[in-house]
Every structure is written in structure tokens, then in C-alpha cells.
Amino acid sequence: MRHYEIVFMVHPDQSEQVPGMIERYTGAITAAEGTIHRLEDWGRRQLAYPINKLHKAHYVLLNVEAPQEAIDELETNFRFNDAVIRSMVMRTKNAVTEASPMVKAKDERRERRDDFANETADDSDAGDSEE
């Protein structure tokens, strides 16, 4: 089986349907005896240029190992699902399991924010004890 990186963009008004779509697509891959190596829901993001008069879309990234038939079925599902405004399937040499740069940056921002919140909480506790 080959490795693939799949990115699809969902209409922003259909964002609440994304978890169901992810479940359906991953189910189709696992039913064909494929494996999901990475699944990232990037959420609603600004588009580089308008697509169908839309300026935002909900992004999802999948790295899978699956037979060609499963990928063909997935592409057909993307094509006939009106909520999917763009999709891209690329074959890769190896399975990619590490977090993408987008997720790494998001995690770093979250860690910095949490560290800052902890520091300010410690500073306010220290200030209270001096009184």
C-alpha cells in the first residue's frame, strides 16, 4: 500500500459537519484495510484568495496508508460532496506521523500563553503575601 497526504477544505457554513465527515472518510480508509498515520483538524482559516466568493474554509489534513481503490473512493466522495470546496491528494514516499508546522506553532503559542498565565498567577500570589 502507498502513503498519501490528503488535505480537504470544507465550506465554512458546514463546519459543524466536519467531525462526521472525518469519521466517514477515516472509516472508508480503515474499512479498506488502510491505516491513518496523522489526522489534524486545522479549523477555520483565511483563504489566500476567494473561492466561490468565500474568504474562509475549514481545513483538514490526513496522512494515510491505503490501497488505490480507497483513495479513488475518497476522491469520488470529495467530488460529490457539495460541502467540500477543494481537496488535494498527494502520494508520499513515507508515512508522516509528526505534527505539521501549523500544529507545532499552535502548540507553542498555547504553551507560551499558559506559561505567561502561570507566571502572572505566581506574581499575584507573591504580591498578596507581602501585605
UniProtKB/Swiss-Prot annotation:
Top-rank taxon: Bacteria
A cellular component annotation (GO) from this entry: cytosolic small ribosomal subunit
Chain segments carrying region Disordered: 98-131
SUPFAM superfamilies, per database record: Ribosomal protein S6
Ranges of Basic and acidic residues composition bias in the record: 104-116
Pfam hit, one: Ribosomal_S6
Example GO biological process: translation
GO molecular function: small ribosomal subunit rRNA binding; structural constituent of ribosome
UniProt KW keywords: Ribonucleoprotein, Ribosomal protein, RNA-binding, rRNA-binding
Disulfide bonds: none
Acidic residues bias: start-end ranges: 120-131
Matches recorded under PROSITE patterns: RIBOSOMAL_S6
Biological function: Binds together with bS18 to 16S ribosomal RNA.
Homology family: Belongs to the bacterial ribosomal protein bS6 family.
Name of the protein described by the UniProt record: Small ribosomal subunit protein bS6
Originating organism: Enterobacter sp. (strain 638)
